[in-house]
Swiss-Prot record:
Alphabetic keyword roster: Cytokine, Cytoplasm, Inflammatory response, Secreted
InterPro entries, per database record: IL-18, IL-1_fam, IL1/FGF
Record SUPFAM superfamilies: Cytokine
Pfam families: IL1
PANTHER family named among the record's database cross-references: INTERLEUKIN-1 FAMILY MEMBER, INTERLEUKIN-18
Positions of the propeptide removed during maturation: 1-36
Task performed by this protein: Pro-inflammatory cytokine primarily involved in epithelial barrier repair, polarized T-helper 1 (Th1) cell and natural killer (NK) cell immune responses. Upon binding to IL18R1 and IL18RAP, forms a signaling ternary complex which activates NF-kappa-B, triggering synthesis of inflammatory mediators. Synergizes with IL12/interleukin-12 to induce IFNG synthesis from T-helper 1 (Th1) cells and natural killer (NK) cells.
Record's protein name: Interleukin-18
Subcellular location field: Cytoplasm, Cytosol; Secreted
GO BP terms: cellular response to lipopolysaccharide; defense response to Gram-positive bacterium; establishment of skin barrier; immune response; inflammatory response; interleukin-18-mediated signaling pathway; positive regulation of inflammatory response; positive regulation of NF-kappaB transcription factor activity
Residue(s) at site: Cleavage: D36, H37, D71, S72
The keyword Transcription is assigned to this record: no
A GO cellular component annotation in the UniProt record: cytosol
């Protein structure tokens, strides 16, 4: 039995150019090159909790807040407690690219535009032709903790979704992660069947 020939994945460059102190290579054939983008894959239905075991919940004002809620109450409060996490194929390798949406009366997708966390009334797009987006987060496991997750903004490097107490509410915010073991940026994600 003969071995199959492996396709050549090399790019032949025919020219180099300096533009504004940056060296660019011109490919002989760029048909197979892929531009930076995110492409939507399959969704997962999930419940998201902070480390105080409070459930992420969409309140009447369409704002993401955390509330004390036993597991038995989560299905009764669906769809405000069930989040649709769409995974995206990323043309760069930076972690699992996801959007976080909720289907209450209408589909809303989590955004961190201008570093303010809110839900935008929109379906997550099939493709995002950019390497950063206010609705794309990189879902990463916390080293040494299989069940702990962090969500880093693709638009604001080093900024993560976090839980913060404001007055009597625990809100979902975007914050720069500090190096002191900040637990406010860590969550558990429980996938639903």
């Amino acid at each position: 039995m003969a071995a199959e020939q492996v396709e050549d994945n090399c790019i032949s460059f025919v020219e180099m150019k300096f533009i504004n102190n940056t060296l660019y290579f011109v490919a002989e054939n760029d048909e197979d090159l892929e531009s930076d983008h995110f492409g939507k894959l399959e969704p997962k239905l999930s419940i998201i909790r902070n480390l105080n075991d409070q459930v992420l919940f969409i309140n009447q004002g369409n704002q993401p807040v955390f509330e004390d809620m036993p597991d038995s109450d989560c299905p009764d409060n669906a769809p405000q407690t069930i989040f649709i996490i769409y995974m995206y194929k990323d043309s760069l390798t930076r972690g699992l690219a996801v959007t976080i949406s909720v289907q209450c009366k209408k589909m809303s997708t989590l955004s961190c535009e201008n570093k303010i966390v809110s839900f935008k009334e929109m379906n997550p797009p099939d493709n995002i032709d950019n390497e950063g987006s206010d609705i794309i987060f990189f879902q990463r496991s916390v080293p040494g903790h299989d069940d702990k997750i962090q969500f880093e903004s693709s638009l604001y490097k080093g900024y993560f979704l976090a839980c913060k107490k404001e007055n009597d509410l625990f809100k979902l915010i975007l914050k720069k992660q500090d190096d002191n073991g900040d637990k406010s940026v860590t969550f558990t994600v429980q996938n639903q069947h």
